[in-house]
């Protein structure tokens, strides 16, 4: 099998800086094969972009699993698209498990448009107060993360989270925020 593989350093214009990602434009649809390639690449993510009926589809793999969304590998894929696939375009659109993603090229700048994560009120305020050892003003739940909003940035600076309790809650992560 012959594949054209690119490695791109996202978020930088300097070689060996930024966040590296593997990029493969191919019609591979075999999930097991994509996982094996990502494992061998051993980068935080490898993006696989296929074209079906004039639309691009993107999937991302860490060395160990497929992920639903990856910003830097999407930017890396757009860079390859603009520079090696179709240099006449200034927008790269790809469908993913997280929805439609767009990268817009304006001169040497790239703008990434990700789907909005819908936030809903999180009902168990007491639990989040225990997690942060501080009472938040509001708590919202996104697709994978809990967002706790506090009164001011000094509260954020002095938070003493209960990391053991965090690990017991089935979410990807916690975000503490305040107006600064």
How should these model regions be labeled?
Residues 1-69, 73-180:
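Active-site proximal loop and beta-alpha junction motif in alpha/beta enzyme cores
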């Amino acid at each position: 099998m012959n594949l054209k593989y690119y490695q791109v350093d996202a978020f930088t214009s300097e070689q060996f800086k930024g966040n590296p990602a593997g990029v493969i434009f191919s019609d591979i649809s075999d999930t097991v094969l994509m996982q094996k390639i990502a494992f061998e690449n051993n980068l935080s993510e490898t993006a696989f972009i296929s074209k079906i009926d004039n639309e691009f589809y993107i999937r991302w793999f860490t060395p160990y699993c497929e992920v639903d969304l990856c910003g830097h590998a999407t930017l890396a894929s757009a860079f390859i698209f603009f520079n090696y696939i179709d240099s006449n375009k200034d927008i790269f659109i790809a469908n993913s498990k997280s929805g439609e993603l767009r990268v817009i090229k304006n001169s040497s700048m790239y703008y990434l448009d990700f789907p909005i994560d819908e936030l809903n009120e999180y009902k168990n305020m007491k639990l989040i107060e225990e997690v942060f050892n501080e009472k938040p003003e509001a708590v919202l739940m996104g697709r994978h993360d809990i967002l706790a909003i506090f009164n001011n940035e000094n509260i954020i600076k002095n938070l003493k989270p209960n990391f053991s309790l965090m690990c017991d809650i089935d979410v990807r992560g916690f975000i503490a925020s305040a107006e600064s």
